[in-house]
Swiss-Prot record:
Lineage top rank: taxon: Bacteria
Domain Exonuclease: 426-582
Organism name: Streptococcus thermophilus (strain ATCC BAA-250 / LMG 18311)
GO biological process terms, semicolon-separated: DNA-templated DNA replication
Protein name: DNA polymerase III PolC-type
Gene from which this protein is expressed: polC
EC number assigned by the record: 2.7.7.7
Record-linked InterPro entries: DNA_pol3_alpha_NTPase_dom, DNA_pol3_finger, DNA_PolC-like_N_II, DNA_PolC-type_N_I, DnaE2/DnaE/PolC, DNAPol_HHH, DnaQ, Exonuclease_RNaseT/DNA_pol3
Record's keyword terms, sorted: Cytoplasm, DNA replication, DNA-directed DNA polymerase, Exonuclease, Hydrolase, Nuclease, Nucleotidyltransferase, Transferase
Localisation per UniProt entry: Cytoplasm
Family of the protein in this entry: Belongs to the DNA polymerase type-C family. PolC subfamily.
GO molecular function per UniProt: 3'-5' exonuclease activity; DNA binding; DNA-directed DNA polymerase activity
Length: 1464
């Protein structure tokens, strides 16, 4: 005790004889401050340990009372060296903190003092209703409590406030109930007041209509509701009463409270904004009155707008509601006079369009259009759905795409001649213009440098007055002002002088097509000769000479080569810089390629892949007939596989090669006809348009963004462009089609596209900002909704009625009539051909059956094989079975077991030929010696593994036991004609080899990974909306955010591949008969190509093999390698293994030691928290019950709210509840139902259709079930199920799980080694190697974080690992340190009872580095940390981490030994 502290204790009369004195005397005063003016003292005390609460309160009271007696104030802070405390002490201090708040912050104290509090291990969790969390009141509360606790020494206590959902619900209900009761009370008081007035008033003379009855009042209320003024939602931003909205319900949720009341929460939009709405109803009977509140309905609502304290947003409490009719847009033209849309995008246009193809086709059909075209950007992924939808809707679908057309080779030199590059004279020039169109914009500067052998010999620089003020955009871009051009020479004079300046020279420009195009257009306009001398384009020169550079613009190139460019976009500076670059290029092209002649640049430098840098132009391609469909599939494939560069490109020569059966349209403003017309005029456009079958024109509104981009002056210019496009077509006698460039259905949907497109960011071309600085904004998007015929005619009314009708209706109908109906998706299954597949399957089946069951076969086996083979061979499925068998057999030969998934284990043929281990026959005994068998067919056993041990009645050999009693119908359907879906679980280590086996068996050109299409997910859509809100200064209420996110979700974002699915094309066809192909995620370096279509779209037409990677086979292989035990020899009914499911004794530990009451931690299928809970509730003892658990855990609404309750209430047992789908059919057949009906009931239940089928059908099944004594609880259970797990799948999983469990019980060190090597996802070596206490402490730490929802995904994975570490340590095994010379790269090493971790278990050390480190140590010892870094490939951080863990011992920093080291 310090002297000052001892003096203080004496002055406050702290009793020295009390126990408290012995505790407090370790204290000291660290510092003291006196604020004289305030007569206030502030102490900082220090104690070794946290004071007991009794001692603390005694000290606190004496301290304050002593200073109070002196008329002074005192405050203090306590620092504690050891701040550990038990729960009761923390609770006491927490109560003290609340008392402190009571006097200083009573409002917060009163708010929180009655909340639920959970205290444990330096952690305080407070449970609070949602509105407290939403108002952020808890943040202030936490800060205040934390301050008080910190001042008394508890600075390390974490405090969190979690939502008390039960309290939230109760408060919300109470709030509504109280509000209703207040309303009722007010109405009652009003009635009483009215009655009092009536009673005190003289009785009026009798009237003919004395009083209105209730019905009349009600009708008046309804009439007022019907006539009420409708308020747009966007106008309501505060609480208001009796507001009336009309809108569309886009989301509905109902929930029932504990008291039986029901709240209907729904969201309505009028497309100006959206509102959340609420309606409370007393019970389910009253709920019927509000049946109109369902998604998709239009309603009129009246109610009060209130700020809901629970959602913290404006919400309408609905008083009146009625369904209203909503008239969608209609096409008003008569039948036969309706247009065909030839340019429409669906949500498969990547991040660019909104409607599904179904919505597009439904709209066209509703309007009575005879056909509609699908033209997504560069893909045809909506074809299959469009094909099916069009057939259903009775409308012709025209299948097309908007392709990215590129030139095959872009020349470097135009008008090439035989000239030596070093000897030629060059005129390097640049022009500045008022815009990009040589037709609609004007020259304002021509500048040039005449150069010879790298020297400037003459210069040209003239401004040109366009005759009107320059736009701000032009001045900002070029730096040229009106003052520059004012008084300049006439244009003709400048052109003539420039032609004279260029005589005898080679012209040079960067992006020469623009500059030359502008010059030629002006030459032609003034009857001057166009450019005929050679022209070098330095942009293409750079692209071909330096293909490794990503950017070849003038700015990036001058920076790279150190060429001055002081004023980019002023012609004189640009021209001189381009000239300097030219001579660098001439020097480099000689040094790199030996080229010296101008002609060689085109013939020898332009590469075959110059299409990669070629400017993309859009063209619309349409399938005209079946040949065209296959050719489009080829073009899409080639564009994605052979010519992909940023986007899928189609070189012109490739389109020419596959043009048969395809109609080519000129597309949009990004098409080359439109671009040529805009840039070079009608004559040039006519030349370009010759390539196309028809010319597209679009409504002026579609071209409007070009005005914002300064490419077109105004709307009048747009109309003239459209007339010019029609003139181009007329000169060539080609039809003109008016198309809408559709990107969404209705005008109000434009916001969805706006959000999606802006989410691409400013790097996307469509979002390139116009202007600079704060004013920079992307160009507006066009009005691209699906237009009706009359709307389209209105758009083109400026052309005159007849011409508008011709291009909108007549020509589109005529073109649609030229297009034939095609078959996009085939009707039948086309399996590959394998010689003698049917014979091989049959032979292998019978051979194995004879080997196991003898010859002749038992009738039950013979009949099952005959039944199955009849379906398999008769429907052409033999090749699917044989292919699967070959794959499984190859993996087996490599030493891996293969697990089956799905229902393939329902097929006995699959068992016999080795596809699956699951035997679907009824439970039976089988003699391994004499093949005698006994079958149990009365349903008394659910699995043959549960039969009691028995000796063969014929030869006395112990029987083997097998059979899971699974009907074949669950695999191929009742009639055996359902396409088999064989899913197989290969070892993750062997999966790549299994994939390659498919290629080897069927051929690389016939095997493709199953493609997938990734779309914008709900959460991502929400993020896009919030991002748009932020970036564009919008504000949306929550309901509107939800509405916008729903509109945005589902748009294509990327492509991918199924993790194990491989599609096999029959070898007598090619892939383009079914689908285009591509690379996953546009990764042209991927090893496999994928189907372009989502594989689900063609899975009934081609063979799909699911070759999945799984840990179980890998783990089994590891255990076999460690132990030498063949996993196939492990019994499925090992009694010690079964004990794992009822306790922990078999592991030699107590439940308290490992934190769970069973031994299933780390056992596949049973080790998750959810399934462990099921195991603890049910304590299964048989294999059949484990199958039940597997089915129950994988199903939906099979366990929770169903089987769990039946078992708890004693109505059924684990054995008798519905667990797997097949159990229904088997149980019902044993009960006496017809097999066909039993199968149908099973199918209805497993797909969640029981309550969706007609009441008549369902009642028929129920009657049959009751007639056969099926209990009511069983029937009710069927009605709750949404999805069921196949028994065969469960059996395969459980068999694998029990093999792993066998090693856990009987060979634990092998088990733990395999588990950590293969299954563990996260490691923390410092903790794992530090012993039990450290492991348990870290687990507690993560538990606390989980309670506060603060645990990271990594920590959650780590917790799972630590559970197994803890169990291993409790069983007497140890976890060793990393060892630089023992640890392996990726797998744990066994040393006696100790596991040595591998290098990859160290955080931040990857597999490749781990392998490099192991290889390096084989070469010799590491003599220093420097050597370890260099040879081992370790970073400095990793070396430091190893050193901190003590793994490097005394390893020196480098190899240079001190001269004196040897003396010591």
């Amino acid at each position: 005790m310090s002297d000052k502290f001892k003096l203080l204790l004496k002055q406050i009369h702290f009793p020295q004889h009390e126990e408290a004195y012995n505790e407090i005397k370790s204290g000291s005063i660290e510092s003291v401050k006196l604020f004289k003016s305030k007569r206030q003292w502030f102490f900082v005390f220090s104690f070794r340990n946290l004071l007991s609460y009794e001692t603390f309160t005694l000290f606190d009271n004496l301290l304050h009372s002593s200073f109070d007696s002196l008329g002074a104030k005192v405050s203090y802070m306590i620092n504690v060296e050891d701040i550990s405390c038990d729960q009761s002490l923390l609770e006491a201090y927490f109560s003290y903190a609340l008392d402190i708040l009571k006097s200083s912050h009573f409002s917060i104290y009163s708010l929180f003092s009655n909340l639920g509090i959970e205290i444990s291990n330096n952690s305080i969790s407070v449970k609070a209703p949602a509105h407290i969390l939403r108002e952020n009141l808890h943040e202030r509360f936490i800060a205040l409590i934390a301050d008080v606790l910190s001042n008394v020494g508890l600075s390390n206590v974490s405090i969190s406030v979690l939502e008390d959902k039960e309290a939230s619900s109760s408060l919300e209900e109470a709030y509504e109930t109280n509000k209703i009761s207040l309303q009722e009370e007010a109405e009652s008081q009003a009635r009483q007041a009215l009655q009092s007035i009536v009673q005190s008033s003289p009785v009026p003379p009798p009237q003919k209509h004395q009083a209105q009855n209730f019905a009349e009042k009600q009708s008046q209320r309804v009439a007022s509701f019907d006539k009420a003024e409708i308020t747009p939602m966007i106008e309501v931003n505060s609480e208001e009463n009796r507001i009336v909205f009309e809108g569309y319900i886009f989301d509905v949720e109902q929930r029932e409270t504990k008291t039986g009341r029901i709240i209907i929460n729904f969201k309505v939009t009028d497309y100006t904004s959206s509102f959340a709405m609420q309606r409370w109803v007393k019970d389910s009977e009253e709920l019927v009155k509000f049946g109109m509140i369902k998604k998709g309905n239009w309603v009129r609502v009246r109610g009060r707008i209130e700020n809901n304290p629970f959602t913290h947003s404006l919400t309408m409490n609905v008083q009146d509601i009625k369904e209203i009719s909503h008239t969608p847009r209609k096409d008003l033209m008569p039948e036969g006079q309706k247009r065909v849309e030839f340019h429409a995008h669906t949500n498969m246009s990547t991040m660019d369009a909104i409607p599904t193809v179904e919505e597009l086709i439904d709209t066209a059909a509703f309007w009575g259009h005879p056909a509609v075209a699908i033209t997504d950007h560069a893909n045809v992924q909506s074809f299959p759905h469009g094909y099916h939808k069009a057939k259903k809707a009775g409308i012709k679908a025209i299948f097309g795409l908007e392709a990215n057309l590129v030139e095959d080779k872009v020349p470097i030199v135009y008008n090439s001649e035989n000239l030596e590059l070093k000897e030629a004279t060059y005129v390097v020039f640049d022009v500045e213009t008022t815009g990009l169109s040589a037709v609609h914009n004007d020259l304002i500067q021509i500048a040039a440098s005449k150069m010879h052998k790298g020297n400037i010999v003459e210069q040209f620089d003239e401004f040109i007055d366009p005759g009107y003020p320059l736009s701000a955009f032009t001045t900002e871009l070029t730096g040229i002002t009106d003052n520059h051009v004012k008084g300049a020479k006439p244009l003709v004079q400048v052109l003539q002088e420039f032609q004279e300046f260029c005589k005898g020279a080679v012209l040079v420009a960067h992006n020469a097509t623009f500059d030359v195009g502008f010059m030629n257009a002006n030459y032609e306009r003034h009857q001057l000769p166009t450019i005929s001398q050679p022209v070098i384009d330095t942009l293409e020169f750079a692209r071909n000479l330096y293909p490794e550079y990503k950017r070849h613009g003038l700015g990036p190139l001058t920076k790279r080569f150190g060429v001055a460019l002081d004023h980019h976009h002023m012609a004189n500076y640009d021209a001189e810089a381009t000239g300097r670059l030219l001579f660098i290029f001439i020097k480099d092209v000689f040094e790199k390629h030996g080229l010296t002649n101008l002609e060689q640049l085109n013939t020898e430098l332009v590469s075959d892949d110059s299409y990669k840098k070629s400017r993309v132009k859009h063209a619309t391609l349409y399938v005209q007939n079946q040949t065209g469909l296959k050719n489009i599939f080829k073009l899409v494939s080639l564009s994605n596989v052979s010519y992909f560069e940023g986007v899928a490109r189609i070189p012109r020569k490739v389109l020419d090669e596959y043009r048969e059966g395809i109609i080519v349209g000129s597309a949009c403003a990004d098409g080359e006809v439109f671009d040529t017309l805009l840039s070079h005029g009608i004559d040039k456009a006519v030349e370009v348009a010759k390539y196309y079958d028809f010319i597209e024109v679009m409504p002026p509104a579609i071209y409007a963004p070009l005005i914002a981009k300064d490419l077109i002056k105004d709307e009048e210019a747009i109309e003239q462009l459209i007339r010019d496009l029609i003139e181009v077509a007329n000169r060539l006698d080609k039809p003109v089609l008016a198309t809408g460039n559709v990107h969404y259905i209705n005008p109000e949907d434009a916001i969805y596209r706006e959000i999606i497109v802006r989410a691409l960011g400013q790097g996307a071309m469509i979002n390139r900002p116009i202007g600079k600085g704060e004013n920079a904004q992307p160009a507006p998007l066009p009005e691209a909704h699906f237009r009706t015929t009359n709307e389209m005619l209105d758009e083109f009314a400026f052309l005159g009625k007849d011409l508008a009708y011709e291009i909108v209706v007549a020509n589109t109908q005529a073109m649609a009539n030229q297009i034939e109906e095609v078959e996009v998706v085939k009707k039948d299954l086309y399996t590959p051909y394998i010689d003698r597949a049917e014979e091989q399957v049959a032979e292998m089946t019978y051979a194995k059956a004879f080997e196991l069951y003898g010859n002749p076969l038992p009738d039950i086996i013979d009949l099952r094989i005959e039944k199955e083979l009849s379906s398999i061979l008769g429907n052409g499925f033999a090749v699917i079975y044989l292919a699967s068998q070959m794959l499984v057999n190859r993996s087996n030969e490599r030493g891996y077991l293969v697990g089956s998934r799905g229902s393939v284990g329902s097929s006995f043929v699959a068992t016999m030929i080795g596809i699956t281990e699951v035997n679907p026959m009824p439970p039976h005994y089988l003699c391994p010696k004499c093949q005698h068998s006994e079958f149990i067919t009365d349903g008394s056993y659910g699995s043959g593994f549960d039969l009691p041990d028995k000796e063969c009645s014929e030869c006395g050999t112990e029987y083997k036991k097998d059979g899971q009693d699974i009907p074949f119908e669950t695999f191929l359907g009742f009639d055996g004609d359902k396409v088999p879906d064989i899913d197989l679980n290969f070892s993750g280590d062997d999966q790549p080899s299994a994939h390659l086996d498919v290629r080897d068996i069927f051929g690389e050109q016939y095997a493709f990974r199953a493609g997938t299409v990734g779309t914008v997910a709900d959460r991502t859509a929400y993020g896009f909306v919030k991002g748009y809100e932020r970036d564009y200064n919008k504000f949306y209420r929550d309901a509107e955010v939800d509405r916008l996110a729903m509109g945005v979700a589902g748009v294509k974002r990327n492509t991918g591949q199924h993790p194990g699915g491989i599609v096999v094309i029959p070898n007598y066809m090619d892939v383009y008969d079914f689908t285009p192909v591509q690379y996953p995620a546009d990764d042209v370096t991927a090893a496999w190509q994928t189907t372009h279509f989502n594989f689900h779209d063609i899975d009934e037409n081609v063979l799909k093999l699911d070759i999945l990677g799984h840990d179980d086979p890998t783990m089994i292989r590891k255990l076999q390698d460690l132990s030498g035990i063949d996993p196939k020899d492990i019994r499925a009914d090992d009694p010690d293994v079964m004990k794992l499911f009822s306790g922990t004794e078999v592991l030699g530990v107590t439940p308290e030691q490992i934190g769970t009451s069973t031994g299933v931690l780390g056992i596949p299928e049973f080790g998750t928290n959810f399934v462990r809970g099921m195991v603890e509730e049910t304590h299964p003892t048989t294999f059949a019950e484990l199958l039940q658990l597997s089915g129950l855990s994988h199903g939906t609404d099979v366990w929770l709210g169903n089987a769990q309750d039946l078992i708890k209430e004693g109505i059924a047992t684990l054995k008798t509840v519905i667990g797997c789908r097949d159990d229904i059919m088997v149980y019902l057949m044993h009960a006496g139902l017809d097999p066909k009906m039993a199968f149908t009931i099973m199918e209805r239940v497993r797909k969640g259709m029981w309550l969706k089928i007609s009441e008549e059908e369902r009642n028929g099944y129920i009657q049959a079930m009751r007639e056969n004594n099926v209990p009511d609880w069983y029937i009710e259970s069927c009605g709750k199920i949404k999805y069921m797990f196949p028994k065969a799948h469960a059996a395969a999983y459980v068999m694998m799980a029990l093999r792993v469990a066998y090693f856990k019980v009987h060979h634990p060190i092998y088990y733990y080694c395999a588990y950590f090597s293969i299954r563990a996802k996260a490691f923390e070596l410092k903790t794992m190697s530090a012993g039990l206490d450290a492991v348990k402490a870290r687990m507690e730490d993560i538990k606390e974080k989980r309670q506060r929802n603060e645990a990271t995904n990594l920590e959650n994975d780590l917790f799972t690992t630590l559970e197994i570490v803890n169990e291993m340590l409790e069983r007497g095994f140890t976890f060793g340190q990393l060892d630089l010379y023992k640890s392996q790269a990726t797998e744990f090493l066994i040393e006696g009872d100790t596991l040595i971790p591998p290098f990859i278990a160290l955080e931040g050390l990857g597999e490749n580095v781990a392998k490099q480190l192991v290889a390096a140590r084989e070469e010799g010892e590491f003599l220093s940390k420097t050597e370890l870094r260099k040879r081992g490939g370790l970073s400095s951080t990793l070396v430091e981490r190893l050193d901190e863990m003590g793994i490097l011992g005394n390893m020196p920093e480098d190899n240079q030994l001190s001269l004196f080291d040897d003396f010591f």
